[in-house]
Every structure is written in C-alpha cells, then in structure tokens.
Amino acid sequence: MASLIYRQLLTNSYSVDLHDEIEQIGSEKTQNVTINPGPFAQTRYAPVNWGHGEINDSTTLEPILDGPYQPTTFTPPNDYWILINSNTNGVVYESTNNSDFWTAVVAIEPHVNPVDRQYTIFGESKQFNVSNNTNKWKFFEMFISSSQNEFYNRRTLTSDTRLVGILKYGGRVWTFHGETPRATTDSSSTANLNNISITIHSEFYIIPRSQESKCNEYINNGLPPIQNTRNVVPLPLSSRSIQYKRAQVNEDIIVSKTSLWKEMQYYRDIIIRFKFGNSIVKVGGLGYKWSEISYKAANYQYNYLRDGEQVTAHTTCSVNGVNNFSYNGGSLPTDFGISRYEVIKENSYVYVDYWDDSKAFRNMVYVRSLAANLNSVKCTGGSYDFSIPVGAWPVMNGGAVSLHFDGVTLSTQFTDFVSLNSLRFRLSLTVDEPSFSIMRTRIVNLFGFPAANPNNGNEYYEISGRFSLISLVPTNDDYQTPIMNSVTVRQDLERQLTDLREEFNSLSQEIAMAQLIDLALLPSDMFSMFSGIKSTIDLTKSMATSVMKKFRKSKLATSISEMTNSLSDAASSASRNVSIRSNLSAISNWTNVSNDVSNVADSLNDVSTQTSTISKKLRLKEMITQTEGMSFDDISAAVLKTKIDMSTQIGKNTLPDIVTEASEKFIPKRSYRILKDDEVMEINTEGKFFAYKINTFDEVPFDVNKFAELVTDSPVISAIIDFKTLKNLNDNYGITRTEAFNLIKSNPTMLRNFINQNHPIIRNRIEQLILQCRL
C-alpha cells in the first residue's frame, strides 16, 4: 500500500550511511596546492597566526589638567578654569571685554612694606600702593567697570602655591580669594561675558568646570609633582586647537598589504530593518482547535542612504530559546484550544543576519577584530482573532519585549537565489509592558512576546548602529574569495518552506477522495513518489538519498530504532531465561504497552492519561504487522503523493523536509482498535477509550487487563472510521453486521463503496482526515 514509502525509508537507512562514507572519502582526497612567495601566499587558506590588530575606541577623554601652555592672549572658552602659575612679581594677567569689565591681577612677594609700584596695565602705566607682611605671596585683583574710573583692589588672594584662577560661567567671571589652604571662589557680573579676552604673562593650564573640585585642590595645595619638573615644557596654545573633520561613516582603511593578500579595515554605519515571521496552523475538524502558533525565519530586503550612497540591504530574522505555552478550554470538540503557541521572553534571543552590497561584505571570509554597537528597540505585539464557527471569538493581544545588542558573529543567509556571507547580530530580550492575554479565556496578564501577531501591522522594526571589522582580502580587487571557504554558524533557515507549507496545506481542498482511496492502495515506492518532480533516474536516486538522510532523524525513525533495540534485548533475554512463560511476554517488551496499561489498572482516570502514549506505540506495531485494511499511513502517504504532484514549489532541496515533516505531523488525531470475537477495544491519541459490541455498537466496560493481553498478540487496526462515526452512521442510516465488520477493519473496498455513493457521514470523516494532513 501507499505506506510502503515510509517502510522503505526506514529499512533503507543503511544506504545513507554508505553515501555519507563515500562523500567523506572523497573530501579527504589529497590535492596539489601551488605556493607563491609571501607570508599570505597560500591562495585557499588564511594565515595561521592572527594578532589582535588595532583596537579602536571612539570615546574622547578630556584631560583634567591640560597644559602647561605658553603666555598668550586669547578669548577663553566658557565653562573652563584658566589656572595661572605665577613665577615672578608683577602683572599676572589682564582681562577685559572693553565695555563693562576691566581687571588685572598683580603679584606681591612676601615681606614687602607699604610701597608705591608702577605697573603697565592695558598699555597704560598705573601706580598702586602695595604691601605684604606675610610669608606667602599676595595677588591683588584690581578692577574697574568703566574706562573713566580708577582701579581699586576688589579681592586679594594670599597663597603659598602661587596659583591664580579665572572662570567664565553663568554670565559672571569667577576668581579665587582668601588665604590658602582655605581659599574660595567669588564672582563679578558682566553684561558681555562671551567677549572677555585675557592676556596671560605666565604659564597656565586649562581645567573643565566639571573638575572644579580638582581646580580648588590645586589652588589650595599646589600642582601635582610631575608638573613642577623641568621635563614639562609649556606649549603654544595653538597646539590645543582641533582640526575639525567630518567623520566618514563609510570608510575603508588598508591595514597591511603583502603579496597576494591585504588586510582591509571597514567601518560602516548601518540601519537594520527586520520583521518576524510566524506560522499559525489550525487543526482540521469543527474549527475550534489550533495546533500551533510559532515563529518562523523571515527575510526582508530594503534600501537606505548611507553618507549619500544608496545601499541595498538584506536581513533574516530568527528566534532562539522560545517558550511553549498551551491552552485547553475543555475536552469537547467545540471547546477552544491551542496545542502550542510560542512566546519569547528573557531567556530567548533574536538573531538578525545583515548583509548589504558594500565592499565590506564582498570578501567577508577571513575576518578578525569584529566589533559592533546597536541601539535598542521595543517590539509590541498586535491582536489575532481566533475565528471559531459559533460564539464570540477569542482574541490574543498585547505582549512586548525590548531588544538589546548582545554580540555579533559571522553567518550565512540563504535567499531563494543566492547565499550571502553576513553578520549575525545577537539581541537579548527584556520583557516590557503591556502584558499579553487571550480574551474570553483564563489567559491574562502574562509577560512575553507571543508569535500570534509579532509585527503588529508594522512593515518592519528598525535599529541603527555601527560595525567595524578587519578582513583578509585578495590584493586584486577584481578577485572575489570563494564563498565555499566561509565558516558559517548556521545553514538555511526554512529556505522556501514557509511559502511551500502554505501552498501544500491549501491543496487539501482539491483532493478527490475516490482517487485518494485508489492511490492509498497502490504499493508506492520512493521512485514513484518522487517521479512527479524529476523524470531522470539519477536525480531521483539522489533525491531518495537526501530524503533518507533527513528521514533517518525523524521521530518515526527514532521510535522504530528504539523499538528494534528493545526487541533484540527481549529476544536475547528469552534465549537465556529458561523460565519464560511464553513468547508473548518477551514480545510485549518492545512496546511496553502491556506494562503501561497494567500499571494503571487501578485507576480509570490513569488509563485516559496513558492512552495517548499507547496509541503512538500502536502505530509502530501496525506498521510492522501490516493488515489487509487501510491504515492512517496509507492515507497520509497518498495525500503526500497527491500534493507533491500538484505542488509548483517542491524541489529536490525542500522534498526531504516535506516528507519527514509529513511523517510526523500528518493526521495527528488517530484511533486504533483491537478485535476479539464480537468485541472491539478502541483508543485514540486524545486519551479517549471505548469498548463496544460489533452487532449493536453498544458500549461495554473497558477491560484494562483484557486489553493488556490482546495488545501483544492481536493485529492493530487503524480506526479510519472511528467509533463515534460508526455509531452515528448506525443510528441515522442503519448498517448490516457485514458492513460494520468491514468498516471496523478499515476494508478499502467498503470505504470506496460508501464514498462512491456520496455517503455524507463517511465522506465527512475522510475529509476531516485529509484536512489533518497539514504541515
């Protein structure tokens, strides 16, 4: 039958190992390499030893004590202390704005009796009577507010450090007065602060006002020792001037150049735009159940201007470390439920892979000194309506996270047409307001970012930032390093699978049921399964190998492998143990179904909780001991074959994912039954179990011990027409014992007859099974 495809995939897994071994031998084959002179001459490989290179830091540090500078005349900036180191008696500095402010400071050495001295101030000779009867120097601050007035002593600083300070700030001129080490500041007002200039006759320093405490310390206690040595030479003030140059956001610097290779350092300002992808899958049936709401990788391409240059960029957004939530509104078919919906929180990461068409990405193969910095962005979730057939719709809304830059590595993006060497920016998460909830349910006030509507109507989220890297590139700019040498951190995320899933699932409405039954009965093999894609035998063999490589890691293949190992262990123990009661006891070891059921014999509720696990194991036994009836895997494989033939997007790259996913996800709601005389025992994956008579369909008590005995030696049958459908059919139309027996055994001829008669109950049941064949 059609399910032969799954059995072939399971039994032919050995060919995959052989294929891998052949590929490995081929890759280890020796090759001749031509070596040219130069430390980087080996054209296929980068240098072995890499230094850390230049470490760039854009932080500008302003010195606390800037100087000393030579005597000069200039207009001092606001908010900076000018600290003057007087080294002789006489005029220390002169300062004026030529309107309402004239001041000069004169220095008087210790032990001076009252005396008249001549000083040249602002180009004029002035006579002041001065005296100093202390052991310290005195600095007289002479001041006038009009050119017609005479200078008078406004403040005096008595100091043993011989330091004088002046500051322009807040519309006032600030100076020190008093006696060290307890000198303090005082100020004079002026209406024209910005135009005040100063002529300094001694060495001086510049200190930012933010470091005023240090300036106060120097005035009262003196300069640091290093400033008082002869090795400190004052510089002209012009040496402090900065040649302002507009920073280049798009800069390429040659770090080194030797032979065939050169090291290029790239700086780039970037704008990252990305969006989240998601997948919402509704379970077939009455329309009240959803199977999953999950995140998917999403590509986004856009253009932006960078330093006048038009840049084309491409991003891929994916998530890691999702949290799985679920909601079950009840056990009835009309109760709303979500089997799994994904939420990202503090333990999650968002990855954004970025590429643009600049030179930095052209040869991004051998890279070092990779650094980056990005802004943060807040993502707020939108609303999603669960459109149930009857009643008020539940609505999932809200949820928010903030994304913060957490690191950068190399990666490779795969688009539909080309693979791109990229930068992967890792973003950590913090949860934010608002919380998310599902209206009309008990799910309220949960924090995180659900996958239901992550973009919230926005075309994209945007982050700006900057990165730099040093790349080893060919000296010849026309040569591009082969991408095959790139070391990537991931492979293709979903490729075209998202679009393919949507197309694949939409084809369910176009499948003719009569042809489906016929197709399910055909012994389809791998080559007939894939013939709709490629006609040549060679390509079909290659695709079959690729499918087996992927299928080998599927849940179904893993379960079969575990079962085989258990069976071997059971057979081995049977051959060694002479007290074995029967072969059935050993055979039962491979499923553990007998033990599972026996262990719960004391509690009927426990039976319900275990039947889901048991039914999955029954699928494996049915596959090994095939009956004449049709199985769920026959329908699953037939639908898969039909959709492969109808699909326009399936190719050899996506086929392995499709076949493997179909084996795991097609028809998740399955029922299996075991017959004994005129009684049927039936369990399903939802935890329901029934026991009933074939003649009347009357339910009888479910005998757990009897089921445990039967499950080891009786054939397992797929309940294509389950108990509820059978009872509905009998109650409304009436069926004979022969028809009932054939439907219970999933006889394909009987099923085809009912479908050809367009019987509504049977037809609806088959339609529901087809709708469950979703990815």
Curated annotation (Swiss-Prot):
Gene Ontology CC annotation, any one: host cell endoplasmic reticulum-Golgi intermediate compartment
Pfam families assigned: Rota_VP4_MID (PF17477), VP4_haemagglut (PF00426), VP4_helical (PF17478)
Stretch list, region Spike foot: 509-775
Positions marked as site (Cleavage): 230-231, 240-241, 246-247
Keywords: Capsid protein, Coiled coil, Disulfide bond, Hemagglutinin, Host cell membrane, Host cytoplasm, Host cytoskeleton, Host endoplasmic reticulum, Host membrane, Host-virus interaction, Membrane, Outer capsid protein, Viral attachment to host cell, Viral penetration into host cytoplasm, Viral penetration via permeabilization of host membrane, Virion, Virus entry into host cell
Coiled coil: 483-517
Residues spanned by motif KID motif: 643-645
Cystine residue pairs: 317-379
One GO process term, biological-process aspect: permeabilization of host organelle membrane involved in viral entry into host cell
Region (Spike body and stalk (antigen domain)): 247-478
Motif DGE motif per UniProt: ranges: 307-309
Region Hydrophobic, annotated ranges: 388-408
Region (Spike head): 65-223
Extra remark: This strain probably does not use sialic acid to attach to the host cell. In group A rotaviruses, VP4 defines the P serotype.
Family: Belongs to the rotavirus VP4 family.
Name listed for the protein in its UniProt record: Outer capsid protein VP4
Species assigned in the record: Rotavirus A (isolate RVA/Human/Italy/VA70/1975/G4P1A[8])
